[in-house]
Amino acid sequence: MGQKVHPHGLRVGVIKGWDAKWYANKKDFADNLVEDNQIRKFVKKELFSAGISKIEIERAAKRVKLNIYTAKPGVVIGKGGSGIESLKKKLTNYISGKNILINIVEVKSVEAEAQLMAENIAAQLEKRISFRRAMKQTMQRAMRHGIKGVKTSCSGRLGGAEIARTEHYHEGTIPLQTLRADIDYGFAEANTTYGKIGVKVWVYKGEVLPTKKVEKEEANA
């Protein structure tokens, strides 16, 4: 089942954390969940040019904190913090009666972030660049940044073909069923003249958890 399940969801509680860090009772849970979804969609659309790889949402009683992971923090912050203030004002349409805090986290290795890689391939497909060339170039750039493996997939009417199909390419290793393997996953859609093309990217960055046996041996030594 490691082939089918979302790599992040499979590893939550093992080596990955939640992107929504809050607790709510039954009465408020659904409202908060819908609000989170609206916030993510809006921020992604508003700051698409900034290369947003992930948005974490933390909630307290009357406070909502957004941790925005971006490749271009300057674009989000703006001159003298004007970008953040503008974003806060627009977010009041989705978050009412709560104090909004925004924390910007810079993504260091853009070429090794699965979500940004998927969006990059999708953008190239929209510019009518060959899907094979877009996938292979993106993978080669990622491998040069010291990752262990990368796999890409494009689904749809590739090259304007009559029948939709899926093509995969991979370099290195992608141990999807190994829970201690740090696998990043990204998905994007390209709107072409022939219809939508789905782009998926898996990036293997190495193992996270050491074996418990080794830890015990070191403790006893």
Swiss-Prot record:
MF (Gene Ontology): mRNA binding; rRNA binding; structural constituent of ribosome
GO cellular component: cytosolic small ribosomal subunit
Domain of life: Bacteria
Entry's transmembrane regions: none
A GO BP entry: translation
Signal sequence extent: none
SMART domains in the record: KH
Recorded family membership: Belongs to the universal ribosomal protein uS3 family.
The name this protein goes by in its record: Small ribosomal subunit protein uS3
Species assigned in the record: Clostridium botulinum (strain Eklund 17B / Type B)
Organism ancestry: Bacteria, Bacillati, Bacillota, Clostridia, Eubacteriales
Gene this protein is translated from: rpsC
